């Protein structure tokens, strides 16, 4: 089974990232997970959690925290440039960066890879695989907009975490679930019936 890469950067919106992992695993998907160096601090400040850096300990952390046994979860360090997912020969269904910081987005847009997240995104673009980027920034400046345009021209999908009020959400969880489905539906990984 081809995996889905989830990358979490240091932008705000850790709740969406957590729910994404949970929903994919509950739907028996194979997930390759990369957290950027900055995302650990965001997780601590937004969610009050200390995520282990070591991949095996991190996998067990997520299994326990999200209370999910199904699916396959493989965790990678942000600086592991020799990871299998850094190569085009590692087949995936696609990659979702949620949330995506503007620094990460800018480096991907310019083909500059400092870490495993940026390298994987570059691989997805060069291999013509689905790359879905969920930038979490407001307001946007012209540099942000130009970088988003460059990625859209390179056929990345730009899916900001924008709520849909027409669904009449009753809770924050309803809003988060809508965003998660929006991110992963195009990969055939999850739909509203899976929640």
Regions found by a protein language model. Name each.
Residues 126-179:
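Short, glycine-/small-residue-rich phosphate/pyrophosphate-handling segment
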Residues 10-13, 96, 151, 183:
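Buried hydrophobic positions in well-ordered alpha/beta secondary-structure cores of metabolic enzymes
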Residues 74-146:
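Helix-loop-strand module that forms the ligand-binding subsite of alpha/beta enzymes
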Residues 37-60:
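N-terminal beta-loop-helix "entrance" segment that forms/cooperates
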Residues 193-195:
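Conserved small/polar residues in nucleotide/adenosyl-binding loops
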Residues 68-75, 154-156:
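A short helix-to-beta-strand connector/capping loop
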Residues 2-39:
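N-terminal phosphate-binding or glycine-rich loops at protein starts, especially the Walker A/P-loop
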Residues 184-191:
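Short, hydrophobic alpha-helical segments
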